[in-house]
């Protein structure tokens, strides 16, 4: 016998209609927040960031691929990783279906990581992806946009991420928390090396030959980009998580 509340169809409908009003309010608030994102002031980018792409060396403006808007997913794949972050990989599984639609709405979607291009290409082939993915190896891009931190920064006890200073334990290795060490092992490294990268997304606009930064989000801010969680939040048991359960799509038994 289930422990969950059981009701009649009429009781379900009454509760569902009450929830529907809350969902509608959330949608209205989401629309308002989307407009506030668009209303943020733009910040001019004068630094000459360089990237390696499948087409060759590229500037930030080149990543727009002839369009006026650029969305970059900061994919956690550091130079010392042997594979991409499994969480970022789960998010990226949804990119290919969106790329063509965005491209036909004047928006380019691109992933950027610090790993050398050859590593990104090999992993991209393994995952069966086709979306654009650029390497920012030897560039300040990831650090400047808050998704790369040195071991020295972590050892200082304070790291700037997600628009705040994070208080961290300099001696933390990940061994104290098996979950953290398990995630690090999944990319072939240890926790201090793994956490030098961080997830996030940034938006840019190109106007009159000038690139402007318009928006960035990190941590739970990328939840909305993680397709499987949008489905799980509507499943009977929700996220129902216990530890590091997700894998790359080619690592499941089914």
Question: Where are the predicted features?
Answer:
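Catalytic nucleophile loop
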Residues: 103-120
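Non-globular targeting/processing and membrane-anchoring segments
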Residues: 1-105, 122-128, 132, 138-254
């Amino acid at each position: 016998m289930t422990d969950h509340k059981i009701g009649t169809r009429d009781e379900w409908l009454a509760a569902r209609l009450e929830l529907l009003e809350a969902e509608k309010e959330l949608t209205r608030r989401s629309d308002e927040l989307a407009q506030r994102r668009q209303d943020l002031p733009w910040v001019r980018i004068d630094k000459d960031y360089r990237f390696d792409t499948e087409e060759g060396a590229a500037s930030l403006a080149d990543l727009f691929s002839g369009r006026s808007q650029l969305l970059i997913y900061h994919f956690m794949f550091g130079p010392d990783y042997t594979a991409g972050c499994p969480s970022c990989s789960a998010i990226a599984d949804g990119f290919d279906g969106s790329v063509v639609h965005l491209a036909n709405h004047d928006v380019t979607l691109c992933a950027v990581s610090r790993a050398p291009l050859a590593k990104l290409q090999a992993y991209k082939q393994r995952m069966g992806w086709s979306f654009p993915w650029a390497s920012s190896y030897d560039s300040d891009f990831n650090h400047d946009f808050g998704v790369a931190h040195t071991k020295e920064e972590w050892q200082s006890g304070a790291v700037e991420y997600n628009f705040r200073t994070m208080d961290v334990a300099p001696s933390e290795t990940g061994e104290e928390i098996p979950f953290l060490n398990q995630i690090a092992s999944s990319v072939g490294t240890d926790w201090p090396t793994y956490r030098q990268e961080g997830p996030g997304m940034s938006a840019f606009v190109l106007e009159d030959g000038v690139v402007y930064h318009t928006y960035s989000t990190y941590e739970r801010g990328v939840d909305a980009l993680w397709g499987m969680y949008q489905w799980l939040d509507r499943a009977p048991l929700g996220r129902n998580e216990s530890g590091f359960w997700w894998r790359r799509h080619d690592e499941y038994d089914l």
